[in-house]
């Protein structure tokens, strides 16, 4: 079964190793089609011209508009593959990750009696030391599987926090409240049913996506086995909001537009393609996560005012 992998990168030196790890550790690399969006300087561009797995779009980093826009562009490279996977450009993979994810998706679909399942969770952690990777395991970054619940984060954006599995034997995937954008695995139908919003720049993207997916019948489960790694925080690596990459000060405007759009989605002012299909379904999701998202968000806006 074919897998389309969406990978957006912003001036990320980890990108080539991410793509190599993805392909080399798959049981069936012949089934992989990878949509890469490189946002970088011309001299930084990775040459994938001889990699038959990769379809790509390159844009100069000055035209970057955040993760949402880049992930939306990556989805435009999808060509009807059976499965859709979204990763960050600083990821690593365990052997057989593709076979394991398809199997765990089947387990989750069986538990839920619903084939429209999104697998998502916080990946394990790694860091790049010189020319090799090192696994990081500590209280903040455990190696065992966890679920996620919606969190009002310290940045005053909606994010997620880790929650332990109910079944500590980790026999089957368990339901979660929201997605992690750096690891999504679902049927390929997700691309057309829930296209990525290009106008949500970065912070807060995941709750809006979870709202749109869940209210369209896609339930979110966390895999019962960890199969990939993420380079968290990445000190001294390029970020689009860093001063050196934001000399024209456009990031603040993009984030303001993004936050306003998120608020409209939370309140139900935006319904349809870019929001929940209806207010009743939106409220069902808030009941599911047991959180008054628009109320908390409005309190924050009032505090700022």
Per-region residue spans from a language model:
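Catalytic cores of eukaryotic secretory-pathway lumenal/extracellular enzymes that build
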Residues: 2-299
